[in-house]
Amino acid sequence: MTVEMELVGVRVQMPTSTPILLLREVTGRRRVVPIYIGGPEAHAIDLALSGTPTARPMTHDLMREVIEGLGAALERVVITELREGTFYAELFLRDGAGGVQTLSARPSDAVALAARTGSPIFAEEALIDEAGIEESESAEDEGDEEEMVEELRKFLDEVNPEDFLP
């Protein structure tokens, strides 16, 4: 079963300056899934979130234009699994004839493309069970984003990529 996620943003883990993509469940337990990504991908996602125009199309802008130019649309993105410390994702493209094509993608590329097309992001529930982090009760009850961010920062300061290995 898949669960709809919202793109919280990209944060930087200190002291390594490693970018981390943060996705949160839209409903339910509102767990957060942190995904380590590369610097260029983090920049691409930040540009999409901020709506910052660029002089020339970025790679994910080009991907969007190619998809639309072929008469297709990005229906949704699904973060599918975590295997040996690596996250996997799939793009679901609806073609002009109404068929759906599924393409394997890195989560960072899938999310960057979804951010540019306004397409929904989902994650497999088993993946959220495995890699998700619970929000604190008080942050959820009070709607205190700052408390949630601080809790997440503490987690990110202590976590290592190896923690996600089986």
Set out the residue ranges of the language-model regions.
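Divalent-cation
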Residues: 1-166
